[in-house]
Amino acid sequence: HTRPELMDGQNVAAHTWRTVVILHTLWPDVSKNCLLNMLYHDVAEAETGDMPATTKWRYPELNELMARVERDYENSIGVGDTVYKVTDDERAMCDIADKLELVFHCYRLMQQGNTLANDVFLKGVGYLQEKYLEKEFFEPVKEILNALTSEYHKPPRLQVTLEQFSNL
């Protein structure tokens, strides 16, 4: 994650491992190519750098250009879509796993008191719901997002404790 306030020591290897675990946990029957696609999904960042997801969301035309540059680089080193072909649904599942890992990461930061993660958390949830809500394979993700967002809207435990003390 490229925003310094959200990094918390996470690197591309840790992010990638988590995305592969999320992908395989949610959809254990995905193809080997899909798993390999997920494994290599951020390898181009070694060449291009990593643009924050929020910037990609804000500037779709820049996102399209970066996607093309990354795709060209991946294909030049033999790890791109031309090598590991995936279906449109599998590509969507990889995107979901990638964004869900971001949501989980931000959720953990928020639990630690990092309020700077709130905006990215909510944008990540919104992105997933807006783009994939109608897809049948999105069902398990809906449950996860519902659980995370219902927990997000609860007041922090410290706030509840202080309110209980003030009522004594």
Locate predicted features:
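Alpha-helical, largely C-terminal catalytic domains
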Residues: 1-168
